[in-house]
């Protein structure tokens, strides 16, 4: 288990890296781009995540933990972006 200081440092680093990624993909003014709807992106990823579970009672489907993990990572990226805009 990580101590609180290490955990905070790792989370801070994740947000810094997300900011770098957003600058690379969306430009240095990404925080002011009103066309980037992070919450819609989160909802979309949530819907995609459901497709990798067996929630559809009309169809037999295997659960894909690898794909679920990828969707959760995508959700985390979009959530960090939204938090950087709405909590700065």
Go through each PLM region and give its residues.
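Flexible "arm" and connector segments at domain edges
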Residues: 1-88
């Amino acid at each position: 288990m990580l101590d609180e200081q290490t955990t905070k440092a790792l989370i801070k680093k994740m947000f810094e890296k997300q900011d770098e990624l957003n600058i690379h993909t969306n430009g240095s003014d990404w925080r002011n781009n009103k066309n980037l709807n992070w919450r819609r992106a989160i909802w979309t990823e949530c819907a995609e995540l459901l497709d990798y579970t067996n929630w559809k009672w009309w169809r037999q489907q295997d659960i894909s933990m690898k794909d679920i993990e990828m969707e959760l990572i995508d959700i985390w990226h979009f959530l960090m972006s939204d938090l950087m805009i709405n909590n700065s």
